[in-house]
């Protein structure tokens, strides 16, 4: 049965990702920045905004004579494949904790790809140059979710989780949110009959996410301080006023989001 579950997850994930991003393989796409990046892929700009994995990947590509814009369709094929693998890892990791009807399992298979195939993710993917640099982040995200939910050795679980998360948010910081949502869901399912264990693991996951996020910010601050990179003007800050402003913005947005998906859906469809 596990073999068929895995196959179903793989096939459905493949169909969803190909439906969402297959068009990016058929022909080249260009963003506002693409033409500039043909001549200068700007690795250190990626470092300035905390995407150190992207920076390293671009530097390596430059040494190998690879251009992320010119070879965008090749990398898009790899990105779609790794996205399917990542989604399978996340889905299987959560499904192992589920003791529910088969219908719920298939709903999970359909739901998890929506974190990566939606209007917000598609907006990112229209920047064709992102295909190459998102590949390691995608794989690391899937591994981070699976190791927390499936690894039994505590020290190994948390060590690998930190490593995978550092790689993942070094590719794209928003991955931290996807990680937290799916891992907290998996923890609830795995230990729903053991509140103490559930809460301790939940706080552990939130703590790891916080530490890795702070690491990302501090690394950029240190490099800027020592003149190794320029200040992007878009960097995160530890100023209390800014943090409170961001929290208020997130809370205010919830009203619009749950009412009509910020204007995308009909009123009051989201709660349903």
Role assignments for model-derived ranges:
Residues 1-18:
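Start-transfer (signal-anchor) and selected internal transmembrane alpha helices
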Residues 6-8, 42-46, 100-110, 154-158, ...:
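Membrane-interfacial loop-to-transmembrane alpha-helix junctions, especially the N-terminal start
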Residues 25-31, 61-65, 92-95, 116-127, ...:
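Juxtamembrane "helix-exit" motif on the non-cytosolic side of transmembrane helices
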Residues 77-101, 143-146:
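Transmembrane-helix motifs of polytopic, lipid-linked glycan transferases
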Residues 141-158, 192:
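Membrane-interface transmembrane helices that cradle and orient dolichyl/undecaprenyl
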Residues 178-211:
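Perimembrane helix-loop-helix junctions
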